[in-house]
C-alpha cells in the first residue's frame, strides 16, 4: 500500500508543469548578452528579435547624445 501511494505521489509531481521552469526562461539573456527576454518590452526598450521561448528580445534604449560625444 505504501508503494502505491509513493508511486502515485511521484507520478503526480512529474505530471505537473513546475513553475520553476518558467522562472528560468523569464528574464533570460539574449542578443549576444546585451538584451533580455521579456513577455512584452518595456517603454524604454526596443524589440530586437525573438527568444527561443517565443518571448521578445528587448534591448534597452540608449541616449543618442552619449553616442555622439565629441569633446571640442
From Swiss-Prot:
Keyword terms: Antibiotic, Antimicrobial, Defensin, Disulfide bond, Secreted, Signal
Signal peptide bounds: 1-22
GO annotation (BP), single: defense response to bacterium
Main location, first listed in the record: secreted
One Pfam assignment: Defensin_beta_2
Disulfide bridge map: 30-57, 37-51, 41-58
Compartments, as annotated in UniProt: Secreted
Top-level taxon of origin: Eukaryota
UniProt KW Ligase keyword: no
GO cellular component, one term: extracellular region
InterPro entries found in the cross-reference section: Beta_defensin_dom (IPR025933)
Family, per entry: Belongs to the beta-defensin family.
Described purpose of this protein according to its UniProt entry: Has antimicrobial activity.
Name of the protein described by the UniProt record: Beta-defensin 104A
Source organism of the structure: Hylobates lar (Lar gibbon)
Gene (name only): DEFB104A
Amino acid at each position: 500500500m505504501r508503494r502505491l501511494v509513493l508511486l502515485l505521489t511521484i507520478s503526480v509531481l512529474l505530471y505537473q508543469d513546475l513553475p520553476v521552469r518558467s522562472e528560468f526562461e523569464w528574464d533570460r539573456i539574449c542578443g549576444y548578452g546585451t538584451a533580455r527576454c521579456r513577455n512584452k518590452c518595456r517603454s524604454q526598450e526596443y524589440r530586437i528579435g525573438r527568444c527561443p521561448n517565443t518571448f521578445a528580445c528587448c534591448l534597452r534604449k540608449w541616449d543618442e547624445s552619449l553616442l555622439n560625444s565629441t569633446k571640442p
